[in-house]
Regions:
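N-terminal ligand-binding/catalytic initiation module
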Residues: 1-205, 437-446
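General beta-strand structural signal in soluble alpha/beta enzymes
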Residues: 162-166, 190-194, 238, 261-264, ...
Length: 448
């Protein structure tokens, strides 16, 4: 519940203006609830109108994308790029291609990105983009033509010192390659305008693994500091089967845990003997198949239709890595009832407010997405650095920097939580630590 008059007033304005964007309202309210002790301690933020400004994007770009499918039919859909806040660096955030994409979804993701990027301590502002294009069932040629059409419009709004997009759901190495090629062709320049590129043309080692590995580094450090515990011997439930889920599984297994689930939009698999990651990689990365194929190939494993059931599997640690609001109150209660004591988020905002309340009332160690999944954008920032210097670091160098960044996020979040009277609260601490850096920059730069 909001109690601070300044916070309540600004949230009411957001609600009135953006009432048709539920994901954005949810993200703003969660952050605002954490920021009440912060704005009470910093009256200069109200004087400078920081809250009013930070919830309003600096620029919203919405554009038509027209492309031709394999049958020669013209398809027309929408593209978006929301350049939310550049107080601490150029806009930075991924591109998502999914039928669920609309302005409200991109807006919530861009808002979260401001604080997430701030937490990495790297000089990156917040932005997000995408389209309601669905690459599933499309040929490589169709995906290429769509990416080229999308970049033809987007290219006039981005640049290595202005806005540096990356991948997100359904935008992986293939799509980034097509987007980069079209940008290079139109602008006639070879620059670090996108991250997540192939190693052959400016990409960074460990970028593919970064979000999943970073999630586990964050979780391990939070468990060590707050619970004097580790992954060793724990049973882990993970949703999703994309890059984040796959590499979270890989790192959790390396840290001594047994991961027993994976899922996609149709259902989930349960393997009591532990997920065979090589099989998942072959299905999902090798030929873009469906996760049910795992149960056909691995004796003793089970496939279940529907995604919610994954949260009924007994576990010690849950790492949601699929999509927003995948864990509701009912699912959170099922996790707690089945022994889960740690939830750290690999997806963006995968827990509803009601689910978070269940975690908090049951002493579950909860790591919010903007902190726990910041590894991807952290290594994107490191890729930008390598592009600027025209050099390439080794996998071990990048991975070491990633681990250090994630451990620092835990430390900075806990320090902020203590400073504002909520010791041990990783969610409030992440929101406060990320916000204060951006707010101070906004105050210093004047009313813009």
């Amino acid at each position: 519940m909001l109690t601070d008059e300044y916070v309540k007033r600004v949230y009411a304005q957001v609600e009135k203006r953006d009432g048709d964007q539920p994901e954005f309202l949810q993200a703003v309210r969660e952050v605002f609830e954490s920021l009440e002790p912060v704005v009470a301690k910093h009256p200069e933020y109200e004087k400078a109108g920081v809250l009013e400004r930070i919830v309003e994007p600096e620029r919203v770009v919405k554009f038509r994308v027209a492309w031709t499918d394999d049958e020669g039919k013209v398809q027309v859909i929408r593209g978006y790029r929301i350049q939310f806040n550049s107080a601490i660096g150029p806009y930075k955030g991924g591109l998502r291609f999914h039928p669920s994409v609309n302005e409200g979804v991109i807006k919530f993701l861009g808002f979260e990105q401001i604080l997430k990027n701030s937490l990495t301590s790297l000089p990156m502002g917040g932005g997000k983009g995408g389209s309601d294009f669905d690459p599933k069932g499309k040929s490589d040629a169709e995906v290429m033509r769509f990416c080229q059409a999308f970049m033809t419009e987007l290219c006039r709004h981005i640049g290595q010192f202005t806005d540096v997009p990356a991948g997100d759901i359904n935008v992986g190495g293939r799509e980034i390659g097509y987007l980069f090629g079209q940008y290079k062709r139109i602008r006639d320049e070879y620059s670090g305008v996108l991250t997540g590129k192939g190693l052959e043309f400016g990409g960074s080692l460990a970028r593919t693994e970064a979000t999943g590995y970073g999630l586990c580094y964050y979780t391990a450090e939070a468990m060590r500091v707050l619970r004097n515990d580790s992954f060793e011997g724990k049973t882990v439930v993970i949703s999703g089967s994309g890059n984040v889920a796959i590499f979270a599984t890989e790192k959790a297994q390396a840290l001594g845990a047994k991961v027993v689930t994976a899922s996609d939009s149709n259902g989930y698999i349960y393997d009591p003997n532990g997920i065979q990651l090589d099989v998942v990689k072959d299905i999902k990365l090798g030929h873009r198949g469906r996760i049910k194929e795992y149960a056909e190939r691995v004796p003793g494993s089970e496939y279940h239709e529907g995604c919610k059931g994954v949260w009924t599997v007994p576990c010690d640690i849950a790492l949601p890595c699929a999509t927003q609001n995948e864990i509701d109150e009912e699912s959170a209660k099922a996790l707690v009832a089945n022994g889960c004591t740690v939830v750290c988020e690999g997806a963006n905002m995968p827990s509803t407010p009601e689910a978070i309340a269940v975690y908090q009332s049951n002493n579950v160690l909860y790591g919010p997405a903007k902190a726990a999944n910041a590894g991807g954008v952290a290594v994107s920032g490191l890729e930008m650095s390598q592009n600027s210097y025209r050099l390439s670091w080794t996998f071990e160098e990048v991975d070491g920097k990633l681990k250090s960044i994630m451990e620092n996020i835990v430390a900075n979040s806990l320090e902020a939580a203590k400073e504002y009277g909520h010791e041990g609260d990783l969610m409030l601490g992440a929101n406060a630590a990320g916000f204060v850096k951006v707010a101070n920059a906004m105050v210093a730069q004047g009313v813009l």
